[in-house]
């Protein structure tokens, strides 16, 4: 009974290590969170209201400056609300 528990534990631990190793090698190739969030917040051209001189909330701020009340996130390059920990 103890041998079966130990072998199941070792098998499970091996599978977890294999998963972590595969994920680490894939994450070097892809920036999954950034791609996923960009696709979630992507705006279709049909839904755009108007072009402005500044970028609003959750808009890309690479070329445009953010509107007043927003700051450009250094990590995601989107206009976000300023927060004490971002200053």
UniProtKB/Swiss-Prot annotation:
Expressed by the venom gland. Belongs to the neurotoxin 10 (Hwtx-1) family. 51 (Hntx-8) subfamily. Hntx-8 sub-subfamily. It comes from Cyriopagopus hainanus. Residues 25-52 form a propeptide. Ion channel inhibitor. This is U3-theraphotoxin-Hhn1a 11. GO terms for cellular component: extracellular region. GO terms for molecular function: ion channel inhibitor activity; toxin activity. PROSITE patterns: HWTX_1 (PS60021). Disulfide bonds join 54-67, 61-72, 66-79. Keywords: Disulfide bond, Ion channel impairing toxin, Knottin, Secreted, Signal, Toxin. Its main location: secreted. Residues 1-24 form the signal peptide. SUPFAM superfamilies: omega toxin-like. It holds the Pfam family Toxin_12. The presence of a 'disulfide through disulfide knot' structurally defines this protein as a knottin. InterPro entries: Huwentoxin-1 (IPR011696), Huwentoxin_CS1 (IPR013140). It is found in: Secreted. The keyword Signal applies.
């Amino acid at each position: 009974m103890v041998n079966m528990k130990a072998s199941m534990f070792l098998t499970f631990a091996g599978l977890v290590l294999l998963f972590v190793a595969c994920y680490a090698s894939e994450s070097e190739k892809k920036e999954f969170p950034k791609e996923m969030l960009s696709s979630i917040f992507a705006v279709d051209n049909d839904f755009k209201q108007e072009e402005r001189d500044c970028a609003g909330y959750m808009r890309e701020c690479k070329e445009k400056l953010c509107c007043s009340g927003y700051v450009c996130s250094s990590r995601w390059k989107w206009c976000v609300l300023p927060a004490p920990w971002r200053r």
